[in-house]
């Protein structure tokens, strides 16, 4: 099965819809600079969300070879702060799909350069919608969980999505 994208550089491009292009995660590294911190020298929560959102968009595009926008964020849990000078390692993985949407689980860890040890500081689900050049939703390949852990993450993402829909979001 194929789908065509209209408009932009990809106009007329045939896209294979038989399965995802890649189910591998995306990991990115960012450094916490002074402008990223508050009066307590800790990373702004909004800056961390932006870093995580970028990783979610990257892994969604890698998964489906589409352009994506963020439609919602759910179950975001800030566990520990990150400080100026820390490195932030963000890993995003597609764990759920629907017709137009990729559910992405994102985990952020801080790396303290003095000890070179990582600790998880935040995690959550980002729901990304594939769009065409007119900003209209378009279909994406579907993710099929393999194994207990992938099924567990699928179920968590589905529960988060269902809760958002029930709340009218």
What name fits each language-model region?
Residues 19-23, 43, 54-91, 95-102, ...:
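Hydrophobic beta-strand-centered segment that forms part of the acyl-chain substrate-binding groove
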């Amino acid at each position: 099965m194929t789908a065509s994208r209209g408009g932009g550089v990809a106009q007329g491009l045939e896209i294979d819809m038989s399965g995802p292009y890649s189910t591998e995660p995306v990991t990115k590294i960012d450094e916490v600079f002074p402008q990223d911190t508050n009066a307590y020298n800790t990373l702004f929560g909004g800056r961390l969300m932006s870093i995580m959102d970028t990783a979610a968009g990257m892994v969604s595009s890698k998964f489906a070879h589409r352009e994506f926008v963020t439609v919602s964020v759910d179950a975001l849990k800030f566990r520990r702060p990150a400080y100026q000078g820390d490195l932030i390692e963000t890993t995003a993985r597609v764990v759920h799909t629907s017709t137009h949407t990729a559910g992405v689980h994102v985990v952020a860890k801080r790396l303290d350069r003095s000890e070179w040890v990582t600790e998880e500081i935040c995690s959550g689900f980002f729901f990304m919608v594939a769009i065409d050049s007119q900003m209209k939703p378009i279909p994406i390949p579907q993710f099929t969980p393999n194994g207990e852990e992938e099924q567990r993450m699928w179920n968590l993402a589905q529960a988060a999505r269902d809760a958002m829909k029930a709340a009218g979001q």
